[in-house]
From Swiss-Prot:
NCBIfam families listed in its UniProt record: PRK00230.1, pyrF
Any GO MF annotation of the entry: orotidine-5'-phosphate decarboxylase activity
Pathway(s): Pyrimidine metabolism; UMP biosynthesis via de novo pathway; UMP from orotate: step 2/2
Keyword line: Decarboxylase, Lyase, Pyrimidine biosynthesis
Enzyme class: lyase
Species whose genome carries this gene: Geotalea uraniireducens (strain Rf4)
A Gene Ontology cellular-component term: cytosol
Coiled-coil intervals, chain numbering: none
Transmembrane feature ranges: none
Protein name, as recorded: Orotidine 5'-phosphate decarboxylase
Lineage, opening ranks: Bacteria, Pseudomonadati, Thermodesulfobacteriota, Desulfuromonadia, Geobacterales
Signal sequence interval, chain numbering: none
GO BP field: 'de novo' pyrimidine nucleobase biosynthetic process; 'de novo' UMP biosynthetic process
Amino acid sequence: MTRDEARAKVIFALDVHEFSDVEQWADMLAPHVGMFKVGKQLFTSCGPAAVRMIQKCGGEVFLDLKYHDIPNTVAMASLEAARMGVKLFNLHALGGYEMMAKTVETLDKEFKGGERGKVLAVTILTSSNEQTLQDVGINIPVPEMVVKLALLARKAGIDGVVASPQEVPLIRKACGKDFLIVTPGVRPAFASSDDQKRIMTPAEAVRTGADYLVIGRPIAAAPKPVEAAEAIIDEIMAVEG
């Protein structure tokens, strides 16, 4: 694995809400990370302009809005995301087969087999555990539920999933090697676990076979963010040899 290939695995969670911060972080980190994750707070505050600014600075975008609605609404929102030129965007697998399949059908009709952003299905949020599922009436262990949702997403034609690193081996076994897996819940050894309950280090996550790692505060809160990003890349390369 080259350094560029290792860098491509790193998605920086751009958890800001001011447009000036978007420009600052994109300009600083575009050469040092593979992608920037734009979530609900930033997109609600700044809209598509945040995506365009990152792209202007040479960065790729993971639009993390987790669509979950009736099938046509999600399909149309996904189409607009793809038209923005983002590399990844997502929806909730819990929205069901019809919602996911309609989205893929709509994208395929628009892009006619051409290159487009990859659509991912969120399985179970990394802040969730067995008790969280039981509280909403799901009496299935987290790993089993994650695999169930991943298989449903694959059946619907979705390109991959967002899942905790602990479930990556199970998803790989169930869904195959050509199914993208993006994992949050990744924290270098020097960082705290924050609000995510199912976590791993970057080295551990890559070792399990994750394609992309979402990392935010360990880079953003570091005294020297560029050095923190490069240290994570070093760790990924060490794992791969």
